[in-house]
C-alpha cells in the first residue's frame, strides 16, 4: 500500500500519545479518588460499612459498564465521523442521550425497586444495608449516563487535556460529596 509520510505519522503519534496520557492521568485520578472514598468510609464508618459500599459499588459498576460500553461501541465511531459538522454532532449527542436514558431507565428503575433482592441474591443477608447505598449509586449512574454523550464529544475532538480535567473534577466532586454526606447520611 501507499506509504504514509513521516511528518504525518509523527503528527498522528503525537495525537495518540497526548490522548493516551490524558486517559492515564484521568484513570489515575479515578483510582486515587476511589481509594480516598474507601479510606474515608473505613475511617468514619468502619470495615463493615466499607464492605456494604463495595458490594453496592460492584453491582453498580457491572450494569453501568454494559450500558456505557454499548454506548461507546455504537456512538463514538458515528460521532468522530460527524465532528466537522456542528449540527450533526448536536443531533447525535441529543439522540444518544435520549437513547441511553431510555435503554438504561428500566435498569435504573429495577435497581431502585429491587435493590434489597439483588443484594440478597448476589451476597447474603449480612449485606442488606448495601441496598440503600446501591440506590444512591443508581442516582449517580443516571447522571453518568446522561453526561457521557457529552464526554465522548471531548474525546472525539481530541481534547485530551479537557477530558483529563473534567474526569478529575468529577472524581473530586465524588470524593467531596462522600466526605460531606457521610456525617449526614451515614
Q: In which residue ranges do the predicted regions lie?
A:
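Helix-terminus/linker motif at the lipid-water interface of multi-pass membrane proteins
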Residues: 31-62, 78-81, 116-126
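Residues that define the loop-to-transmembrane-helix transition and helix capping
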Residues: 14, 48-51, 94, 128-131, ...
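Alpha-helical transmembrane segments of polytopic membrane transporters and translocases
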Residues: 22, 37-40, 49-68, 98-102, ...
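Interhelical loop/hinge segments that connect adjacent transmembrane helices in multipass membrane
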Residues: 1-34, 74-91
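Helix-loop interface residues and adjacent transmembrane-helix termini in multi-pass membrane transporters
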Residues: 44-47, 83, 156-158, 184
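Alpha-helical transmembrane segments of multi-pass membrane transport and lipid-handling proteins
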Residues: 67, 94-146, 172-183
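Short runs within selected transmembrane alpha-helices of multi-pass transporters and secretion channels
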Residues: 1, 26, 30, 34, ...
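Helix-loop junctions and terminal segments of transmembrane helices
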Residues: 56, 60-101, 151-156
